[in-house]
Amino acid sequence: MKLLVCENLCMSYENKKVLENISFSVEKGDYLSIVGENGSGKTTLMKGILGLMPPTSGTIMLSGISGTEIGYLPQQTVVQKDFPASVLEVVISGTVGKSKRLFYNSYDKKTALENLKKLDIEHLKNRSYKELSGGQQQRVLLARALCAASKLLVLDEPTSGLDPIAVAELYEILADLNQKEQMTIIAVSHDIESAVKNSNKILHLGRDTAFFGKTEEYIQTDIYTRITGGK
């Protein structure tokens, strides 16, 4: 079942075309990594998928899923890292957009606690978010995204700024969500080797070339060979 279909998609940023005639689809249970050099339009594409930025032409179609069933984990900013709230408050805020209520209820709190437990950070629920390590903060934000996600997780550079141990732990969590719970994942990544290791499909965006297909097909392409040096 296809959850997302993009056809002949063109998008611009600050009046500059960054995506041109991009076509791909995401099926239920896919783990799609979006890779490519800086400025290739990866984050712009994310905004298009989330409905935050309209395409200049082409289509973005969601099927069997609404915008309130998508969890989003953006790149962290300095302001976010210093956010003055408890872990539970940060996570439970993820339920607000899904329920369209201004305030959370007992069910929302239960959902937040379940996701904290799922990511093995329930013991941190009363800690101040800004006091946590980078890896712990990213788990908290992922738990927040899961409060909104019932079918699809969209992640923008989820491992950015994390140490190698935290990166490995986060990829393990994402693999469990994808394989054991059939959560569909779309992730922008600057780390092509990790993308190849963890994804079943790759969308490579480039200024001159683009690729969409299965990971095993991607690693046979000239694009992959050129970037990795044939590793």
Segments (PLM) and residue ranges:
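Conserved ABC ATPase "signature" region
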Residues: 106-124
